[in-house]
């Protein structure tokens, strides 16, 4: 190897040292004493770097700078600096004995490197006369030697040698090495460098695997969150918040401004009807034309009734006026009975009484409803010339939709000289009839949508605008008691019977609680006074009973309904029983 000429006495000399010379420097064979352990040599002097703007460097130079920064940080713990100008040291300073670096220490340094920002250092590789890097073309394309010329009397820290995996990347462009190369390694140096590089590559692979394992322990990678996942997470969180807001336990405040608190007096039924009659209906011409089309069917209906069919009318709107026109037009000379099914006091017994008393002129009594029905059927079968037209408004009303009521009406309509024409308004009205009842009625269905208001049909219902009469609570009694248990209905029935038995007593103020409890206990309806009080509380909530205390402090029970309504209710209960 040619020795470069030294211009000054204190310049650093670079010699090639073989393997034998290295062993002689590590261990003195003659004296048998170990030499002082030194750190690795300095590859680059960071204090002699001439900075250059980053935009002058190319992309390959940027990668070299990143690796040089890593080399600078990894050499922080160098303890001694190289003595400049010492030519007598020879390979002692260049090939010093290195301490074995443990993988744990390198892992700690790597973790510190990941946590702390790196030091930005710029390198000038083109015009720096003190740093010369030669890149010979070897079999693996790695750099063989570096020439470093530090300044005199400068104390600089030495950087530890970087791993081979990083040193392989410290390659400058080919144009730099071609123009600034001073010497090339011989073939023998290439052969020896190949073996050394193979060993260093193996150590570098093991070192990089340990560093990756430590990094996985120190900091776990955070998965990237795509916009779709972020939107789904936000949507889920919003749904959760909406669920808890909807099911929160906070009290919901509602307004207490109801119609009951209006200071205006309630109207009677006639006044309300007069006010509604002054309102002109919309599309009056179209409604009149629609009713005229239905009136053209009257003769057809009469023919079908005489052929053994019965007619049922359905559709939106009240059909009471339509049936009334049919009665006045076609049934003037015929015997007919009109039944208002929407009336709260109507019952099957009242229908049968109307037939026996008004049509058949029978003033006697019957033991039961079935006996009365058999007598009517026999009378119409005996006299075939006797004809009767039954017009029933709202056959599906609350008072007539019972199974027993429908069975009795169906048997009457099955007679060949009794003609039935009825109307229904409930959507589920056909569910009242099974196959047996359908065969008795033998219906012909006609859609007669009139769009007329249900004025008469709803006049008997409870309203906040109209004063109620004494007969109105009967529908309320029926609705409430049908939703109760059989024992509850039996308790209320006992109270009704006792009140009707004492209706002629002017001093009657009600039934005492103790006497009523004794009667319910004898009828096996309750087993304790707590059960009876719980049932009376339900009656009181529906305003079916009223309690008051007498002068003796005893609690008395009273039903605030007129006796006629209570009598009709008991008769209806007996019919359904």
Swiss-Prot record:
Organism domain of life = Eukaryota
Q: Which GO CC annotations does the UniProt entry carry?
A: centrosome; chromosome, telomeric region; heterochromatin; inner kinetochore; membrane; nuclear origin of replication recognition complex; nucleoplasm; nucleus
Where is the protein found, in the record's own terms? Nucleus
- What residues bear Phosphothreonine in this entry? 116, 226
Keyword set for this entry?
DNA replication, Nucleus, Phosphoprotein
Q: How does this chain assemble?
A: Component of ORC, a complex composed of at least 6 subunits: ORC1, ORC2, ORC3, ORC4, ORC5 and ORC6. ORC is regulated in a cell-cycle dependent manner. It is sequentially assembled at the exit from anaphase of mitosis and disassembled as cells enter S phase. Interacts with DBF4. Interacts with MCM10. Interacts with LRWD1 throughout the cell cycle; this interaction, which occurs only with non-ubiquitinated form of LRWD1, prevents LRWD1 ubiquitination and hence stabilizes the protein. Interacts with POLQ.
Query: Which protein are we looking at?
Result: Origin recognition complex subunit 2
């Amino acid at each position: 190897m040619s020795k470069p000429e030294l211009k000054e006495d204190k310049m650093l000399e670079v010699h090639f040292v073989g393997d034998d010379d290295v062993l002689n420097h590590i261990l003195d064979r003659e004296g048998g004493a170990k030499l002082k352990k030194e750190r690795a040599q300095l590859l680059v002097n960071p204090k002699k770097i001439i900075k250059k703007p980053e935009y002058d460097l190319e992309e390959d130079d940027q990668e070299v700078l990143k690796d040089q920064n890593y080399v600078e940080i990894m050499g922080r713990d160098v303890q001694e600096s190289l003595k400049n100008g010492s030519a007598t040291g020879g390979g002692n300073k260049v090939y010093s004995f290195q301490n074995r670096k443990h993988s744990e220490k390198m892992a700690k340094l790597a973790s510190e490197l990941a946590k702390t920002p790196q030091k930005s250092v710029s390198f000038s590789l083109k015009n720096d006369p003190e740093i010369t890097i030669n890149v010979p073309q070897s079999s693996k394309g790695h750099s063989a030697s570096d020439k470093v010329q530090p300044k005199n009397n400068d104390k600089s820290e030495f950087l530890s040698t970087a791993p081979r995996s990083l040193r392989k990347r410290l390659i400058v462009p080919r144009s730099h090495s071609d123009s600034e190369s001073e010497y090339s390694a011989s073939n023998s140096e290439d052969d020896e460098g190949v073996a050394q590089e193979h060993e260093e590559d193996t150590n570098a692979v093991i070192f990089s695997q340990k560093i990756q394992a430590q990094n996985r322990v120190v900091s776990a990678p955070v998965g990237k969150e795509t916009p779709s996942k972020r939107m789904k997470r936000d949507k889920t969180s919003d749904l959760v918040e909406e669920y808890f807001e909807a099911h929160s336990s906070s009290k919901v405040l509602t307004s207490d401004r109801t119609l009951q608190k209006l200071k205006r007096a309630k109207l009677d039924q006639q006044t309300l009807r007069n006010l509604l009659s002054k309102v002109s209906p919309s599309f009056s011409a179209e409604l009149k034309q629609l009713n005229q089309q239905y009136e053209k069917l009257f003769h057809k209906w009469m023919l079908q009734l005489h052929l053994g069919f019965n007619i049922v009318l359905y559709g939106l709107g009240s059909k009471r006026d339509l049936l009334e026109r049919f009665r006045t037009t076609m049934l003037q000379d015929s015997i007919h009975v009109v039944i208002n099914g929407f009336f709260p006091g109507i019952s099957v017994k009242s229908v049968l009484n109307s037939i026996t008393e008004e049509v058949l002129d029978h003033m006697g009594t019957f033991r039961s409803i079935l006996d009365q029905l058999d007598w009517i059927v026999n009378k119409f079968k005996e006299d075939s010339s006797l004809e009767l037209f039954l017009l029933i408004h709202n056959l599906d009303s609350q008072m007539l939709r019972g199974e027993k009521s429908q069975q009795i009406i169906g048997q009457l309509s099955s007679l060949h000289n009794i003609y039935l024409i009825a109307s229904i308004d409930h959507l589920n009205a056909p569910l009242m009839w099974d196959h047996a009842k359908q065969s008795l009625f033998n219906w012909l269905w006609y859609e007669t949508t009139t769009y007329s208001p249900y004025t008469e049909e709803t006049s008997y219902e409870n309203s906040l605008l109209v004063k109620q009469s004494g007969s109105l609570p009967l529908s309320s009694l029926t609705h409430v008691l049908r939703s109760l248990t059989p024992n509850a209905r039996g308790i209320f029935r006992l109270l009704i019977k006792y009140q009707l038995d004492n209706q002629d007593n002017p001093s009657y103020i009600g039934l005492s609680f103790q006497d009523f409890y004794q009667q319910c206990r004898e009828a096996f309806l309750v087993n304790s006074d707590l059960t009876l009080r719980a049932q009376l509380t339900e009656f009181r909530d529906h305003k079916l009973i009223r309690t008051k205390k007498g002068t003796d402090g005893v609690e008395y029970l009273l039903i605030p309904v007129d006796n006629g309504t209570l009598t009709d209710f008991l008769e209806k209960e007996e019919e359904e029983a």
